Amino acid sequence: MKLFGKPKPKQDTQETIGKLRLTLDMLEKRQTFLQDKLEKEQEKAKVLVSQKRKREALLCLKKRNNFQNEVTKLQGSYDTLNQQIFALENAKMNMEIMNSMRDGARSLRELHGHLTIDKVDDVIEEIQEQMEIHEEISNAISQPLGNQVEDEEELLRELAEYEQEELDAQLLNIKAPSRELPQEIQVNFPTISKTVPKLSKEEEEIRALEESLAM
């Protein structure tokens, strides 16, 4: 029988972070409320001083200081909760990383549990053996039969005879090149007019004078 009742169920980290954030929100609202009260008491004290009501102004300043002290305490709690949230989030992330690494190591261990160096060597050796058998089979299949080799040689000889006959026929059809004389080059000389140009009257007189002197 348990003296203190049932044990509390284990709380999830994310749920804890959520509760801390709610507390932060509550502290922030409380700080805002007290800050507003603080500022009002300070303004009230200034008004009372201007009215020469110093005793009442002193009471307002005391209230302001009380509010200020409370705001300071709340700010300390606020900072502490922020640090806790930061630490929890980092711890949660580290835990998730470790869990992932542990799962990965477990999976590798399970996979390697079915493999050994000897098994790997056996598989590699078997693959090489099968590849050699495949190569031998391929070479055997690709080799021509004996009759096919002889037939091919005979066909090649026949083909060579055809080529020689074709070459001989081409040599017989070749004609000797004919030597042609070069063509006569025609040169066109300018024609000389056979008609005597008509002399002028003065030239006729000079010519007649020359003929008379020659007689």
Swiss-Prot record:
Gene3D superfamilies: ESAT-6-like (1.10.287.1060). GO terms for cellular component: cytoplasmic side of plasma membrane; endosome; ESCRT III complex; late endosome membrane; multivesicular body; nucleus; pathogen-containing vacuole; phagolysosome. InterPro entries: Snf7_fam. Residues 10-173 form a coiled coil. It comes from the Eukaryota. GO terms for biological process: endosome to lysosome transport; late endosome to vacuole transport; late endosome to vacuole transport via multivesicular body sorting pathway; lysosome organization; protein transport; regulation of receptor recycling; vesicle budding from membrane. Pfam families: Snf7. It is found in: Cytoplasmic vesicle membrane; Late endosome membrane. Keywords: Coiled coil, Cytoplasmic vesicle, Endosome, Membrane, Protein transport, Transport. It is a peripheral membrane protein. Belongs to the SNF7 family. Probable core component of the endosomal sorting required for transport complex III (ESCRT-III). ESCRT-III components are thought to multimerize to form a flat lattice on the perimeter membrane of the endosome. Probable core component of the endosomal sorting required for transport complex III (ESCRT-III) which is involved in multivesicular bodies (MVBs) formation and sorting of endosomal cargo proteins into MVBs. MVBs contain intraluminal vesicles (ILVs) that are generated by invagination and scission from the limiting membrane of the endosome and mostly are delivered to lysosomes enabling degradation of membrane proteins. This is Charged multivesicular body protein 4. It comes from Dictyostelium discoideum.
